[in-house]
Amino acid sequence: MLKLIIPSIMLIPMTFLINKKSLLWTATTFFSFLIAALSTLTLNMDVAEHNSTNPLLSIDQFSCPLIMLSCWLLPLTIMGSQAHMKTEPITRQKTMISLLILLQVLLCITFGASNLLMFYIAFETTLIPTLLIITRWGNQKERLTAGLYFLFYTLSASLPLLLALIMIQTHLNSLSIYIIPLSNLTLLLNTPWSETLWWIACFLAFLIKMPLYIFHLWLPKAHVEAPIAGSMILAAILLKLGGYGMIRMSSLFIPLTKDLAVPFMIIAMWGMIVTSSICLRQTDLKSMIAYSSVSHMGLVVAGIFTMTPWAWSGALAMMIAHGLVSSGLLCLANITYERTHTRSIFMNRGLKTLFPLMSFWWLMMTFANMALPPFPNFMAEILIITSLFNWSNWTILLLGLSMTLTALFSLNMLIMTQHEHPNKHAPVNPSTTREHLLMLMHMAPIILLIANPSAIMI
């Protein structure tokens, strides 16, 4: 862990010591790629299930793939932000890159924390750089409203979680995620309603972060108003903090979760259908991708609450695969927006004739979003759907309708943007090597996961 955290921290002063604009982006991208490559070598969990570097930090089969994803996304966000930031003064460019690096450090600490209080502190601290990125570098004035939604939705559930953790510390004198399961937490409470309140306090912060349908209103606003780097990190990593926290907490509340999670599972599956239907009516590309994320994360919520090994493996695989695919789709939407200056699907028709090479990446990312075989999304959905069907036969109706709607809006997005008659645009610049490399770096891990899916299996 420290092999990743310390070099990442040292990237921040290095960023401020570089004075040339051309060297700034090249150097930070190169060194962040080195850290990402280092993560694939150091975070090898084939030998042991648990590897602790100190009492506060450790990695296991849940945290290892998510830390690797966090490290991999940093150079991609830096590459994706170059065109957006080139007109800014060099001081603001350095500030933006430093915030992205700080966010990676906080995410690595969050996923690697073995103490729940340290996990909570890092989990909440990720809010600060994300909020700064959205409110400072967003395009429209609505970014301030989006920042407020993001802030208050996240903070509203933070205090109950902190109180629940303090209560655990008071009774057990420990917040280690490896010691708490050895004791029965349910014996600490005397009444059923207090057990219910305690369980909700522990899970509400993560359900909002996922976000569960009914708590999702902050996500489309934040996605649409954030710059490309903010959108990529939000979709690829920050939503996964909720899933990771739910997996950690579920292992601590096994008897309670099986009894209390049923309403949230039903809401999650119903939310998949509703958000997929909303995607069919969306005209904004980024908003469509945001609602698509709510739909996919609803499947993860339902899978985690079944409390089966298959579902947890599928949830982890879905979080990794969705992180890469949604980030890739947002990059494609941003590449189009930088040339046509609109996110409307109706204004961005017939892009295949304008950017013939980019249409290949649109095709691949759309198929992955639809969870077609052999993409890892397909494997993840099969594992989760099998577990949910084993939990209740009636879930096949909700899940079948949701999968159909997902395929419909994904194909609608692909056909409308690529195969319709093109609108009359002002002359646009062709796609660049940097943009194709950016998409290749999204696609490469997906191809590797197709070849070796056991890398993200529990």
Curated annotation (Swiss-Prot):
GO terms under cellular component: mitochondrial membrane
GO molecular function annotation: NADH dehydrogenase (ubiquinone) activity; ubiquinone binding
Transmembrane among keywords: yes
GO BP terms: ATP synthesis coupled electron transport; electron transport coupled proton transport
Transmembrane domains' residue ranges: 23-43, 59-79, 99-119, 148-168, 174-194, 197-217, 227-247, 260-280, 289-311, 315-337, 355-375, 396-416, 438-458
Keyword NAD: yes
Protein localization: Mitochondrion membrane
SS bonds (residue pairs): none
Catalyses which reaction(s): a ubiquinone + NADH + 5 H(+)(in) = a ubiquinol + NAD(+) + 4 H(+)(out)
PANTHER family given in the database record: NADH-UBIQUINONE OXIDOREDUCTASE CHAIN 4
Designated name of the protein: NADH-ubiquinone oxidoreductase chain 4
